[in-house]
Amino acid sequence: VWLWMEFPFHDQFGGKDTGIDLVARTVEGEYWAIQCKCYAADTFINKPDVDTFLATSGKRFETEFGMTGFAQRLWISTTNKWNSTAEQTIRNQNPPVTRLNLIDLENDDVNWSSLEQGLFGVASRPKPFAIREHQQEAIDQAHAYFKIDEATGQPAHTRGKLIMACGTGKTFTSLRIAENETGGRGLVLFLVPSIALLGQTLRSWLQQSQEPMTAVCICSDPQVSKQTEKKDNDTTSVIDLALPASTDVPSIVKQLQHARRHNAEGLTVVFSTYQSIDVISRAQQQLLAETGGAFG
């Protein structure tokens, strides 16, 4: 991560007020443009606030490997309030925009006091939840249900259903079941009916995971996932997910191939909505073809 003035290629953008505060390079070698805004909690973000950032981060620049551009743009602010025009402006952008608002910072998996004391990484994270008795019972019963039959070498069951009451920790329990059944190393598909639930599950699993986890998000079709009408029950958009979501098959395959090479000791989890099952199928077929059936 670089401060903007320390970014090796910042001089190609000209001017002082570029709207970009930080630049991050991912493990895949992609560049992210990041804007950080410290606002009062009751401040509304307006379209002019985002225009400069979008204009600058949309430009291409030359690196030692040739011309490139920002693959993703991240807006971080200490308010939850957005003018409707500003919110519409950051949707459907290319490169895409995601945002972290005050509510995300407050609920993030970070002990802010630890950061202020100079602690980073695992040392700054709160302790994971302890498994409760009823959750352990569910984990044990799921393991027994899917146990390998010694005679056939195959699981006794390939499908099952776990029913738990509201507030009993279904999301957390499902994570511990996935970790237990894969030994913390494997490829998991998690399907949900809405982007809101996808975002909730994604954050919970990343926060509570006991093993290294690579998450790949596949959003539903744009007309559903980017629905913003107030009358709609699910107003969550892909711009509010903790990680970028995509329906681009080559991009999804690239992420999974990278996870296969670099996360052999952890879980790779594909989070998706039901609407994107066709995208998952096409990505899986391409991945199996590229790996000779060894992964996917």
Where are these regions (language model features)?
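Conserved Walker A/P-loop ATP-binding site and its immediately adjacent core
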Residues: R185-S209, T214-T228, Y274-S276
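Switch/connector loops and helix/strand junctions flanking conserved nucleotide-binding motifs
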Residues: D42-N46, W82-T89, L198-T201, V224-K231, ...
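Conserved two-lobed SF2 helicase motor
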Residues: N263-S281
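Catalytic centers of nucleases
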Residues: V1-M67
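Loop/turn-to-beta-strand initiation segments
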Residues: L187, E265-V269, A294
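SF2 helicase catalytic motif II
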Residues: Q275-S276, L288-G296
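ATP-dependent helicase/translocase motor core
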Residues: V1-L3, P8-Q12, R60-T168, F172-G186, ...
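Conserved motor-coupling elements within RecA-like helicase/translocase cores
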Residues: D232-T268
